[in-house]
Amino acid sequence: MKNNSVRIAFWMVLIFIAGLPMSGSALPLKSQILGPKNSPVGLAHIYIDYVELMELDGTAKGRVSFVKTQSGFELFVVRKDEKNEWTGRASNRRLYGVEGKLLAFYDWTTFWSYVYAPDGTRLGQIKCLAFRGVCAAGAAAYLAGILEKQ
């Protein structure tokens, strides 16, 4: 009798665990993009190899993502619109437009990533608890205005 009780309890626990949603994930990490006066100007959903960028109301603006190229991996910026246009790339803590013009610098500490204009003016910051390179590049793309329609 005792053996049956243990067996029933085991199966009940197993069924309970199997019934839990498997979508429970720590990703995306969510962070606010702060402007030069430390007020929120946008949102970032950060994944391991890309970041989704949004307006404060959740409207998609674009994405920064690693892409495998012949020379390795590069970060590319894509504007979210009807064309999903490539608008720039990030490399060596710098953000460039499609034509190769330097648009912003970015750097990070343990928790914060900072974005600067080419003249050194601070454009803003974002709290990046993980995946700091892609997170900082995403904030740079958002703050430099590269996701705005031309």
Q: Across the structure, where does each feature detected by a protein language model lie?
A:
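Short intrinsically disordered terminal tails
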Residues: 1, 25-26
